[in-house]
């Protein structure tokens, strides 16, 4: 029973970490990365589809992304979606290929992105600690109901804290690496 609760805690924390990592990966750093376009949704085929489902996205060089559109009649809709995304990319079209140029980032932009990164990181840490608190509350209720002993509660608490510390270390390491990438000119 305790192992199930510990596994639940680990799963919930890892899902939170996964969402955090995808959020951090979406932050622009001044270098061309295909993942920056992951959130772009295109109005086509009478609905909304993700850009990467109707085209292939690749990195040409440090400042250029290539979007190879699979059906040329989608080029206009993709251009509109990129413009509406407010990513600030310059672009040119050559048939079914859209070339996106990543603009240089100003120091102010970099500082604002570091602040955003810090906020996202802190929100994730808070979520992880809330998961730990919820799990510990469940364990305390179990101990109050005499389902587990006080020793079991203490041992489980230490193990839950160990899992929490590992996840928060990953968050901190990711934050520091991304901060270094953002501030590197």
From Swiss-Prot:
Its main location: cytoplasm. SUPFAM superfamilies: Ribosome recycling factor, RRF (SSF55194). It is found in: Cytoplasm. Keywords: Cytoplasm, Protein biosynthesis. One of its GO terms (biological process) is translational termination. Belongs to the RRF family. The keyword Protein biosynthesis applies. Transmembrane segments: none annotated. GO terms for cellular component: cytoplasm. It holds the Pfam family RRF. This is Ribosome-recycling factor. Responsible for the release of ribosomes from messenger RNA at the termination of protein biosynthesis. May increase the efficiency of translation by recycling ribosomes from one round of translation to another. InterPro entries: Ribosome_recyc_fac, Ribosome_recyc_fac_dom, RRF_sf. One of its GO terms (molecular function) is ribosomal large subunit binding. It comes from Ehrlichia ruminantium (strain Welgevonden).
């Amino acid at each position: 029973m305790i192992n199930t609760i510990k596994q639940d805690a680990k799963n919930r924390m890892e899902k939170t970490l996964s969402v955090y990592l995808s959020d951090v990966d979406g932050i622009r750093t001044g270098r061309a990365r295909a993942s920056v376009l992951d959130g772009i949704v295109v109005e086509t085929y009478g609905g909304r589809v993700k850009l990467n489902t109707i085209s292939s996205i690749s990195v040409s060089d440090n400042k250029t992304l290539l979007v190879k559109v699979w059906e040329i009649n989608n080029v206009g809709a993709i251009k509109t979606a990129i413009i509406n995304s407010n990513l600030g990319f310059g672009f040119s079209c050559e048939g079914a290929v859209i070339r996106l140029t990543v603009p240089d980032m100003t120091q102010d932009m970099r500082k604002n992105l570091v602040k955003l990164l810090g906020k996202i990181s802190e929100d994730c840490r808070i979520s992880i600690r809330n998961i730990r608190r919820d799990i510990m509350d469940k364990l305390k209720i179990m101990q109050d109901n005499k389902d587990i002993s006080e020793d079991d509660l203490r041992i489980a608490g230490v193990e839950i804290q160990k899992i929490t510390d590992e996840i928060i270390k990953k968050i901190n390491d990711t934050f520091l690496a991304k901060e270094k990438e953002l501030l590197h000119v």
